[in-house]
């Protein structure tokens, strides 16, 4: 008699379901946008952040140069105004025929300069003052910069200064086989001319020295001030306030990941896990001395190879550890850098940890050196340590590490040490009826990925809406899509795999047609495996003929790890075999079934080498029983990923639930046998298997409704269902030979599986509920993106688009294009459209509003007038003859009816095209197959991938109304609101 909520959480979707007393009460879908650039995966805020950073950098440089200009003007008795530019024009001091500053920098070493030329040399060096601190550059850029700096440093050995080097090597030198000059400065994405700032500072000092020798008179104070201002560097911020708190001691900060104690903890964890695995698989018991021998090797050198590990443990060189890959078992690159920078020392462990902490938190080199000076370090050590780059923290503090590491040194695993010390993760005792915002919980520091944060935010929004509508529940089941928590490149790889999988299925469908096979999921999979296995049986090595594929009884799809023991229904756990081989294998792994037959096993090993690595490992696995003992099946049933546990704990720790029955144990983890918990994280593997078994079609990823089907399955994936399903699969595997002998049909199995359906008529009931869903989308009201395009253009470039100079002036007046710093740019995003209606004609008009309008706090009041290409009409002033209706934002829900439609339809607003005065709209569920006759009139160019209508003219719409959709998909008409002004 439980009330259960279930969620299928993706990076841009939430599927949800609510069941009460085993009855499906409600389900729905929420779709939202990923907060990232779809092409690059970069944050949507990145362009603004980079632009803001560039503005600040340029402003600082301008202030620095202005300061220098004042100093120079005062010292050299020059006019400061001559060095200032106005309205983007060239400053007076730089007009006329002038010698290149590179040539002047060379001459400065050999002859007396004029005051004006000396001023230009100082300003030129100060403007492009080289690279100093590149700690915060990304790894790829940093590597290129360092390489170029080193190469140029070697070349500089033959010259007095940087200026002389650049002048003689590159100035007015032709490119090879070209009439173009070589670049003296770096161009975009070029690092060849990168010079260390220290060399430029040395050059300016040398020029001051030489000019004084040549008779140029200036004060020592002036020289010192110029050098100080020209090479001034702002102190970097301290980020200590951003460090999260310890999982066990909430008043303690987390330990730096690159501290010696943290390295010891990580090394101990890996070594203990390795020794325990050897104990379980080989029955070998290792002592505390063995553990210490391995640990000492790591702490001495920062590395431990697999070869060293085998030698220290007395294993043969050809022994292969589980997961062995590459040379190193443990490699701590940062630890190696740390011990190298330290050299010989007499520092305590605590001091070393504090030093690592300072390096991690203090990003300003001068401040860091001051902090390091309080330790027993010489200047060389301080200089070396200050160059290190440390970041990131563990989840626990030094205090916790100092408690657990002594027990781990005795050979206890981390969780065993925590249990012995009674260390428990701090939990929230103040449970709420509604889930609080993630950033108000002690998990707030665990996630910084904006894509994941958006998914968690939308999950909370839907969850709280359901709790408000239906009240408290007993349980919440969640499934996180595998792309949640992945970075953009990882998600792109997943998407590529999905597309390849889709293509392979479509190709197999065509092949089925050619061979006269029924087009069903089973035959499609058989054909895919047939091709992957190069037309050979995975266990016998016999050639599979086309006639074998056409005979339903000849071949079977086998689960490499028996499904009833693994719950692994993935493609990588399936092979195509002759029925006879499957009958022999039964409910066993390949090694358990055929390992005693050495000749056959050798053949299987050879065959497996031609298969994907993941499949190969499963086939050749000799230790599956050990994995079973380690809850391997549970891990396939339950999602143990970090991000899944995080969402689970966030929900469990802060939400108040209805009490579970007395015989349910809520103290056990959801992966432990006999556990009964309020929140469970289900595996996508389980959902996929039940989806197939209960007769739901394969996912159509273009159709949003599949998220709700998954949520329903998650809601009913309880222990009793899973057990019944497991028993059913076990019977299939164990009695395979007998069943085939009796020719039991697939229909018999379909009837048998009904015994573990949640209730009678389950599939149809779910499909009926799915048909009732209106997909919810949040309206995107917040202005975002750049104010205008980056490229500045000449006025003439717009003449063709707007019909000459007068047209461009008109376009500027209407805000179609913008003038910034005397140049013209295209608009940024249109984030809002205000809809008006003529009081007499009832025709609709649209006033576009861009991010630039929002930034300028100027509300446009002219509606777009349609014009032909190459001309521009006056837009229409929305005066007293027009009435304001509503504002549209991206994903606003509207009800529209064109003149050809029989009735109005709900659609989501996507965009407005000012050139055609028309809307772009989309169907809520993006489902092509269910388009009604009326909808087909609207979405006449729809296809399976997208149901979108473009060029919907607004003036003559019969119905044009705005609606509000809740997080649960409940639709209500929007109340009238006064037009919103930016100034309010």
From Swiss-Prot:
One Pfam family per UniProt: HNH_4
Cofactor names: Mg(2+)
Alphabetized InterPro entries for the sequence: Cas9, Cas9_PI_C_campylobact, Cas9_WED, HNH_CAS9, HNH_nuc, RNaseH_sf, RuvC_III
PROSITE patterns in alphabetical order: HNH_CAS9 (PS51749)
Record carries keyword Phosphoprotein: no
Positions of Mg(2+) 1 binding: 8, 479, 483
UniProt GO MF annotations: DNA binding; endonuclease activity; metal ion binding; RNA binding
Biotech and industrial use: The simplicity of the Cas9-gRNAs RNA-directed DNA endonuclease activity may be used to target and modify a DNA sequence of interest.
Active site: 8 (for ruvc-like nuclease domain), 559 (proton acceptor for hnh nuclease domain)
Positions with a binding annotation for Mg(2+) 2: 8, 483, 707
Domain of life: Bacteria
GO biological process, any: defense response to virus
Keywords: Antiviral defense, DNA-binding, Endonuclease, Hydrolase, Magnesium, Manganese, Metal-binding, Nuclease, RNA-binding
Domain HNH Cas9-type: 487-637
Function, in words: CRISPR (clustered regularly interspaced short palindromic repeat) is an adaptive immune system that provides protection against mobile genetic elements (viruses, transposable elements and conjugative plasmids). CRISPR clusters contain spacers, sequences complementary to antecedent mobile elements, and target invading nucleic acids. CRISPR clusters are transcribed and processed into CRISPR RNA (crRNA). In type II CRISPR systems correct processing of pre-crRNA requires a trans-encoded small RNA (tracrRNA), endogenous ribonuclease 3 (rnc) and this protein.
Entry's free-text remark on domains: Has 2 endonuclease domains. The discontinuous RuvC-like domain cleaves the target DNA noncomplementary to crRNA while the HNH nuclease domain cleaves the target DNA complementary to crRNA.
Record-stated family: Belongs to the CRISPR-associated protein Cas9 family. Subtype II-C subfamily.
Oligomeric form and interacting partners: Monomer. Binds crRNA and tracrRNA.
The protein's name: CRISPR-associated endonuclease Cas9
